[in-house]
Amino acid sequence: MYTIYTQNSCGYCHMAKNLLNEQKIDFIEVSLDHDQGARRMLKSMECRTVPQIFNGELHIGGYTELKQYLD
């Protein structure tokens, strides 16, 4: 299962979600606008930008990395 960490004002987050939807890939969205625990977790992993996308335990990265991963 894919998990995507997002913020409402993030254009690349919307693009990543659209890409997953176009590929008919199910995902869970975690909004950093509302989940401080998730924000702390990503910070501890030194992830400073959104989106951050995971396929299970595998950290894919952001939108560009997701696009490459799916190609």
Which role fits each region the language model picked out?
Residues 1-25:
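Local sequence-structure signature of Cys/Sec-based thiol-disulfide redox active-site neighborhoods
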Residues 11, 36-37, 61:
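Short alpha-helical
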Residues 15, 37, 65:
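Residue-level recognition of oxygen-bearing side chains
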Residues 27-29, 59:
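Conserved beta-strand scaffold positions in the cores of enzyme catalytic domains, especially
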Residues 31-47:
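Thioredoxin-like thiol-disulfide oxidoreductase module
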Residues 45-53, 63-64:
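Structural micro-motif
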Residues 55-71:
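Non-catalytic, surface beta->alpha helical segment in thiol-disulfide oxidoreductase systems
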